[in-house]
Swiss-Prot record:
Entry GO terms, CC: cytosol
Family classification: Belongs to the YajQ family.
Keywords, comma-separated and alphabetical: Nucleotide-binding
Record's protein name: Nucleotide-binding protein KPN78578_03700
MF-aspect GO terms: nucleotide binding
Function: Nucleotide-binding protein.
Length: 163
């Protein structure tokens, strides 16, 4: 029986490249001359720390980072940015988290969405991913379109497509 897995992963190497590109752009921009403005990628926590001298500049840096992530093939919805910007001394910073894996609430929404579609497929939650099996390849492709079309707040990839 044909099957595939629905996962949500961020390629850390591409994220590192995007952070490096964003840092290079900030160094060359006129409005950031003489200003302490940095990006720091933490591989262990899968977070990106955006630091600057004002909250307005932190928001500008986040826009630059989102643009660079998008150019590297990482969707902006995979970056979880908290609402509040932390003020510490003379700097402002925000710690944005890269979404890895699918949370259980989102997994349940996806499975419910698939079951409500009345397609002849089965969806099983397996840890951080969802395995979808069905008799017809067309049904599986319909499920892929359904998941892509659903507004679930994070990007999904489809792996291990077996016929």
């Amino acid at each position: 029986m044909p099957s595939f897995d629905i996962v949500s992963e961020v390629d850390l190497q591409e994220a590192r490249n995007a952070v490096d590109n964003a840092s290079r752009e900030v160094e060359s921009r006129f409005d950031f001359r003489g200003v302490e403005a940095t990006f720091e990628l933490n591989d262990a926590n899968k977070t990106i720390k955006v630091l600057s001298e004002s909250d307005f500049q932190v928001n500008q840096l986040l826009d630059i980072l989102r643009a660079k992530l998008l150019k590297r093939g990482i969707e902006g919805t995979s970056l979880d940015v908290p609402e509040d910007i932390v003020h510490s001394g003379k700097t402002w910073f925000v710690e944005a988290k890269l979404k890895q894996g699918i949370e259980s609430a989102v997994q349940k929404k996806i499975v419910k969405m698939i079951k409500d579609s009345k397609l002849k497929v089965q969806a099983q939650i397996q840890g951080e991913e969802i395995r979808v099996t069905g008799k017809s390849r067309d049904d599986l492709q319909s499920v892929m379109a359904l998941v892509r079309g659903g507004d679930l707040g994070q990007p999904f990839q489809f792996k291990n497509f077996r016929d």
